[in-house]
């Protein structure tokens, strides 16, 4: 934000600078600067101690010339001020004339526009009234035709609706039939799904039973020695053969049952036959499972008896030895068979060995699995009971299906009778509809003829509408042109108002600058008067000093000793210009030594006093030269600031005056300004920066409230200015809201136009 302000100030200073690069007009000149303008050769005057009266007169002439130049410069400044006042008066007169002419033009244009607008409004109102009457008559005719056509269309629609209602009723009956059939099919599909689920459950349970049987066999095999394992394997093979025989027998019975069920399926539906077959399978499997369970129980009893016999005396041991011999013979036979089997079934043996290892590892868990298997058997018995109940439910569902089939057949017969009746009614409706269609076709022909007539009338009306639209568009074009002209007039008015505001601001700034220049001229006139008074007093003192010097010289000539006269004259000659310079600078200066010496005699104390005064005067001259340099630097700075503020380029006369006065000050070097000069420049810059920031921040969007707060603290804004900035920021940041009215921040124009706050 501050970088943008700095750039803007730099651009304004660059525009305000003069292309020739000359110095600027000072705002005010102090007494010391004007007094020191003629003292540029003070160093030469102070250093040249042996100058004569001719040098003194030449210096006085120089001073007179400098005073004349200053008077000429003051007259030039006065002429410039007069010229500026004349320019100001001319600008004010031109601005008033321009405003009067613009207001007259605007009033004339406004009156002509209002008159033309009233005429156009009257013509348009008459034309629209006529057209409204014509269109109202045409619309009445069209409404009558429309009513007649709508009545005919309503009759046709009613007939078509009756036909469509009958068709919808037939479609609804067919839909009800299809819905009932689909319901039956859906019920059958549900039953099939239930049966499939039951089959899956039975398969899973049979697998579990097989697993339990295998686990029991493996646990028995692992509990005995290798010989007992071989015997158990043989027994297991025999049991497997028996199971295979049982399975083949059950398969044959199942096939017989399947044949019977297929015969039943021909009588009933396919789903009911499958259900009965599944029930028979379940019963057969349950019987087989009961047989297997009884066989396993017999094996367990046999094994327990064998264990009891083993626990008895030596007779049992002999019997066991016999059995051992028989078992050894059997082992040899089985070994031969095993050798033959190993050659043919190596892969099966490898798998069995791996399984034996796994079973050895699972010996510890076998007992737990036995207890679990007993629990599983109990669960299976409960499941068998559940299956029996499901079988009963299936029988009930079969009975329900039969009842539903009978109900469906009865419903189908009733629906067929309804369909026949509906077909008869449909035939009658078709005959009636054909007759109605003939009538409708005749009516349609009449309607087409009337429609053609309506179309012809509509085309005629459309042509008239096009003509009216063309006329309306032409009038709209005229009104748009008038509106554009009004907008241009309004824009010109706004531009004139802006120009007027700018001119008023420029005039006010010029008035301020003129006031400042008047003050500077008054100060310069006062300084000139003081200089004239000082000049006259200096001339009087010079005459007095000359008389005193002549008296001193006559006194010195009367003395006898020439050496003493020479020694006394030298310091007096060196002190003459110093006394003269002191008299020129101080109008109230008087020589106390000349007054204090009676009879014109000069002593050693007078010489010492004159030397001290000489040193004081030299120091005062040095200080005055420094002050002159500072004042010249201040004049240059004031000229620059004045041109920055007013943006006024000096005339050619100022160039000539400065070219004349330029070589008179060749040895003036810039020096550091006083604290008062810095404060004045800072005040000017402060006011200017405040004006720029106010204008910038009120015309464009600011970034945040804290920036306004910071700037208001730095620049010492008043509470009204800070509130105005906050209100403008809130208005620009909000969607809705009224524009804030500025209070004293923007000056009104001469004609008091309404300035939009942006």
Curated annotation (Swiss-Prot):
Residue numbers carrying Phosphoserine: 30, 36, 41, 47, 50-51
Residues passing through the membrane, by range: none
Main localization of the protein described in the UniProt heading: Golgi
InterPro entries documented for this protein: Golgi-autophagy_related (IPR051952), GRIP_dom (IPR000237)
Alphabetical UniProt keywords: ADP-ribosylation, Coiled coil, Cytoplasmic vesicle, Golgi apparatus, Membrane, Phosphoprotein
PTM statement from Swiss-Prot or TrEMBL: MARylated by PARP12; MARylation is required for basolateral export of E-Cadherin.
Signal peptide residues on this chain, from the entry's feature table: none
Superkingdom of origin: Eukaryota
Location of this chain's protein in the cell: Golgi apparatus membrane; Golgi apparatus, trans-Golgi network membrane; Cytoplasmic vesicle, Secretory vesicle, Acrosome
Gene3D superfamilies linked to this entry: GRIP domain
Record function comment: Involved in vesicular trafficking at the Golgi apparatus level. Involved in endosome-to-Golgi trafficking. Mechanistically, captures transport vesicles arriving from endosomes via the protein TBC1D23. Recognized vesicles are then tethered to the trans-Golgi before subsequent SNARE engagement and vesicle fusion. Selectively regulates E-cadherin transport from the trans-Golgi network in tubulovesicular carriers.
Notes concerning its domains: Extended rod-like protein with coiled-coil domains.
The protein's assembly and partners: Interacts with RAB6A. Directly interacts with TBC1D23. Interacts with FAM91A1; this interaction may be mediated by TBC1D23. Interacts with ARL1; this interaction recruits Golgin-97/GOLGA1 onto the Golgi apparatus.
Protein's UniProt name: Golgin subfamily A member 1
Gene source species: Mus musculus (Mouse)
Gene name, Swiss-Prot/TrEMBL: Golga1
């Amino acid at each position: 934000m501050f970088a943008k302000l700095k750039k803007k100030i730099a651009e304004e200073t660059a525009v305000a600078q003069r292309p020739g690069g000359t110095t600027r007009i000072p705002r005010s000149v102090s007494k010391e600067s004007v007094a020191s303008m003629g003292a540029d050769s003070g160093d030469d005057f102070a250093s040249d101690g042996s100058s004569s009266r001719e040098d003194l007169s030449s210096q006085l002439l120089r001073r007179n010339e400098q005073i004349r130049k200053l008077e000429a410069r003051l007259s030039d400044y006065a002429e410039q001020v007069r010229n500026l006042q004349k320019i100001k008066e001319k600008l004010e007169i031109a601005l008033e004339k321009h405003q009067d002419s613009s207001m007259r033009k605007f009033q004339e244009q406004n009156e002509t526009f209002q008159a033309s607008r009233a005429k156009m409004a009257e013509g348009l109102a008459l034309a629209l009234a006529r057209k409204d009457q014509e269109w109202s008559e045409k619309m009445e005719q069209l409404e009558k035709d429309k009513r007649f056509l709508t009545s005919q269309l309503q009759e046709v629609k009613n007939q078509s609706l009756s036909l469509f209602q009958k068709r919808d009723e037939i479609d609804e009956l067919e839909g009800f039939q299809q819905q009932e059939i689909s319901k039956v099919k859906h019920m059958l599909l549900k039953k099939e799904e239930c049966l499939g689920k039951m089959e899956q459950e039975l398969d899973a349970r049979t697998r579990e039973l097989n697993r339990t049987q295998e686990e029991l066999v493996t646990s028995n095999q692992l509990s005995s020695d290798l010989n007992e394992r071989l015997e158990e394997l043989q027994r297991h093979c025999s049991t497997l053969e028996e199971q295979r025989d049982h399975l083949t027998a059950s398969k044959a019975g199942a096939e017989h049952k399947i044949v019977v069920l297929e015969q039943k399926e021909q009588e009933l539906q396919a789903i009911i036959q499958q259900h009965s077959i599944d029930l028979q399978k379940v019963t057969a499997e349950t019987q087989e499972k009961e047989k297997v369970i009884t066989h396993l129980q017999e094996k367990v009893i046999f094994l327990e008896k064998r264990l009891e016999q083993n626990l008895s005396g030596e007779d049992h041991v002999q019997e066991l030895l016999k059995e051992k011999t028989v078992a050894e013979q059997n082992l040899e036979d089985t070994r031969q068979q095993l050798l033959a089997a190993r050659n043919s079934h190596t892969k099966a043996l490898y798998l069995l060995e791996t399984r034996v290892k796994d079973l050895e590892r699972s010996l510890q868990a076998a007992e737990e699995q036995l207890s679990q298997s007993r629990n599983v058997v109990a669960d299976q018995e409960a499941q068998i009971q559940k299956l029996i109940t499901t079988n009963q439910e299936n029988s009930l569902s079969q009975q329900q299906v039969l009842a539903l089939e009978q109900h469906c057949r009865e419903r189908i017969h009733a629906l067929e009778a309804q369909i026949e009746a509906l077909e008869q009614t449909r035939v009658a409706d078709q005959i009636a509809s054909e007759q109605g269609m003939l009538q409708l076709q005749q009516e349609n022909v009449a309607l087409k003829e009337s429609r053609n007539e309506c179309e012809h009338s509509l085309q005629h009306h459309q042509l008239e509408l096009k003509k009216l639209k063309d006329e309306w568009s032409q009038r709209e074009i005229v009104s748009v042109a008038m509106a554009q002209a009004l907008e241009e007039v309004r824009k010109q008015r706004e531009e004139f108002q802006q120009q007027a505001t700018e001119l008023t601001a420029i005039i006010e700034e010029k008035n301020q600058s003129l006031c400042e220049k008047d003050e500077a001229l008054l100060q310069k006139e006062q300084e000139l008067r003081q200089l004239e008074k000082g000049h006259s007093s200096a001339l009087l003192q010079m005459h007095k000093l000359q008389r005193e010097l002549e008296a001193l010289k006559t006194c010195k000539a009367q003395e006898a000793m020439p050496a003493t006269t020479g020694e006394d004259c030298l310091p007096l000659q060196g002190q003459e210009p110093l006394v003269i310079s002191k008299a020129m600078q101080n109008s109230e200066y008087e020589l106390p030594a000349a007054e204090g010496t009676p009879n014109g005699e000069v002593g050693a104390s007078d010489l010492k006093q004159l030397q001290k005064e000489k040193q004081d005067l030299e120091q005062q001259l040095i200080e005055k030269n420094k002050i002159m340099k500072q004042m010249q630097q201040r004049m240059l700075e004031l000229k620059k600031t004045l041109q920055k503020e007013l943006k006024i380029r000096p005339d050619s006369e100022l160039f000539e005056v400065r070219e004349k006065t330029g070589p008179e000050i060749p040895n003036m070097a810039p020096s550091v300004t006083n604290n008062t000069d810095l404060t004045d420049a800072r005040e000017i810059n402060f006011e200017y920066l405040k004006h720029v920031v106010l204008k910038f921040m009120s015309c464009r969007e600011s970034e945040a409230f804290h920036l306004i707060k910071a700037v208001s603290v730095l620049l010492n804004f008043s509470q009204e200015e800070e509130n105005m900035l906050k209100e403008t920021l809130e208005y620009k940041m909000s969607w809705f809201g009224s524009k804030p009215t500025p209070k004293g921040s923007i000056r009104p124009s001469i004609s008091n136009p309404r300035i939009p706050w942006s």
